[in-house]
């Protein structure tokens, strides 16, 4: 941020009585230089400064920090839940592999049951894929609907 600051050289800053204060003002970044003329304090502003405030007003409010922390916790819980639901999609892939692996083993043991084994394999594939899509849908619901 210091590298991005712009240096100021206006007429009001150059009108200084000493050379030293002018060079100090000209070398200060724009964010540190006050370009407006200072306002004279009025009686109302002085009386508001003199009002004593209770000590409880000096304690900073924690509501902003608490809400930011609770939002972070909610976001983390959302990502953890979506990640856990995504693991179900990987389980679907493992289930499909198991179904077709069992089809190959069953066909190798008894080739005469080819049609019945294939029917059961398609049913197992459909159920496993449906569970995977359900898990993916739950993951997207957790991420974008909550």
From Swiss-Prot:
It is a multi-pass membrane protein. Residues 1-71 form a transit peptide. It is found in: Mitochondrion membrane. Gene3D superfamilies: F1F0 ATP synthase subunit C. SUPFAM superfamilies: F1F0 ATP synthase subunit C. GO terms for biological process: proton motive force-driven ATP synthesis. The lineage of its organism: Eukaryota, Metazoa, Chordata, Craniata, Vertebrata. This is ATP synthase F(0) complex subunit C2, mitochondrial. It is linked to This protein is the major protein stored in the storage bodies of animals or humans affected with ceroid lipofuscinosis (Batten disease). It comes from the Eukaryota. Trimethylated by ATPSCKMT at Lys-114. Methylation is required for proper incorporation of the C subunit into the ATP synthase complex and mitochondrial respiration. Mitochondrial membrane ATP synthase (F(1)F(0) ATP synthase or Complex V) produces ATP from ADP in the presence of a proton gradient across the membrane which is generated by electron transport complexes of the respiratory chain. F-type ATPases consist of two structural domains, F(1) - containing the extramembraneous catalytic core and F(0) - containing the membrane proton channel, linked together by a central stalk and a peripheral stalk. During catalysis, ATP synthesis in the catalytic domain of F(1) is coupled via a rotary mechanism of the central stalk subunits to proton translocation. The modification N6,N6,N6-trimethyllysine is found at residue 114. GO terms for cellular component: mitochondrial membrane; mitochondrion; proton-transporting ATP synthase complex; proton-transporting two-sector ATPase complex, proton-transporting domain. It comes from Mus musculus (Mouse). There are three genes which encode the mitochondrial ATP synthase proteolipid and they specify precursors with different import sequences but identical mature proteins. Keywords: CF(0), Hydrogen ion transport, Ion transport, Lipid-binding, Membrane, Methylation, Mitochondrion, Transit peptide, Transmembrane, Transmembrane helix, Transport. The chain crosses the membrane at residues 87-107, 122-142. The record marks 129 as: Reversibly protonated during proton transport. Pfam families: ATP-synt_C. GO terms for molecular function: lipid binding; proton transmembrane transporter activity. Belongs to the ATPase C chain family. F-type ATPases have 2 components, CF(1) - the catalytic core - and CF(0) - the membrane proton channel. CF(1) has five subunits: alpha(3), beta(3), gamma(1), delta(1), epsilon(1). CF(0) has three main subunits: a, b and c. Interacts with DNAJC30; interaction is direct. The gene is Atp5mc2.
